[in-house]
Regions:
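Active-site metal-binding loops of divalent metal-dependent hydrolases
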Residues: 31, 58, 82-83, 113-114, ...
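Conserved beta-strand hairpin/beta-sheet module of binuclear metal-dependent hydrolase folds
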Residues: 1-46, 119-129, 135
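Active-site HxH/HxHxD metal-binding segment of metal-dependent hydrolases
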Residues: 12, 23, 31-107, 186-194, ...
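Accessory terminal helices/loops
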Residues: 152-166, 170-226
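Divalent metal-coordination and catalytic microenvironments
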Residues: 18, 30, 57, 69, ...
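Core dinuclear metal-dependent hydrolase active-site scaffold
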Residues: 17, 97-122
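Residue-level marker for buried hydrophobic side chains located in beta-strands
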Residues: 27, 52-54, 127-128, 168
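Histidine-centered catalytic micro-motifs
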Residues: 53-63, 108-115, 167-174
Length: 226
């Protein structure tokens, strides 16, 4: 399998490129529009044909490269079926599988950070979007976010996965690249709560600044960055 984790410095976004092997079909998760030319170069270097692009949710801190990649490669665009992005071609449901040749990727509806947030599970690789981060969790104070929904998504879905499941989030701000579900259970400070009410109180008191370009980014991303 080919697996590449790519990092956008400006937004601290992780983008993932997946393929079964060289010369085969590829999929990209959470592309950033400014980096599309780099993705195209990498695809050519690996002799890959991009067939699918997934956004885990409508992002607030960067513009997606989905539409631009579609224009260049004719790939299909994919999001969860709760997305407000009508331009997306394929809307997957909770527990539905996305096929990439011999690879299967399971869609998991994990709202909370936003109302349209999905995570994607491929074997023991979890691409959690902004729902579960390394030593953190996604904020819930905009885009119809909800702390109770986030608690349910994290504690009753993602943390039910095997402890050895690798965690690959859409962001990290401290240089961390990967964790595991087991490690997050033990060490993630936001997961050391005893009830949903305690988690809600914790999230409601974060007092985070609004992303500087949220209105522009969200408007663009509803149109897949076009």
């Amino acid at each position: 399998m080919i697996f590449k984790q790519l990092f956008d410095q400006k937004s601290s976004t992780y983008t993932y490129l997946i393929a079964s092997s060289k010369g085969r079909e590829a999929l990209i998760i959470d592309p950033v529009i400014e980096n599309v030319s780099d993705y195209i170069i990498l695809l050519k270097e690996l002799d890959l044909r991009l067939v699918k692009v997934i956004d885990t949710h409508i992002h607030a801190d960067h513009v997606t490269g989905a539409s631009k990649l579609k224009d260049i490669t004719k790939c299909s665009t994919i999001m969860g079926d709760h997305t407000p992005a009508d331009a997306v071609e394929i809307k997957v449901k909770d527990d539905e599988y996305i096929n990439l040749e011999n690879l299967k990727i399971k869609a998991m509806y994990t709202p909370g950070h936003t109302s349209d947030s999905y995570s994607f599970l491929m074997d023991n690789y979890l691409f959690s979007g902004d729902t579960l981060l390394i030593n953190g969790t996604g904020r819930t104070d905009f885009q119809n976010g909800d702390s109770k929904d986030a608690y349910n998504s994290i504690f009753n879905k993602l943390l039910k996965l095997p402890d050895e499941t690798f965690l690959y989030p859409a962001h990290d701000y401290k240089g961390e690249k990967v964790s595991t579900i087991g490690k997050e259970k033990k060490q993630n400070p936001r997961l050391q709560v005893s009830s949903v009410d305690e988690y809600v109180e914790l999230m409601n008191n974060l007092k985070l600044k609004k992303p500087t370009e949220i209105d522009f980014n969200v408007a663009k991303n509803i149109n897949l960055g076009a």
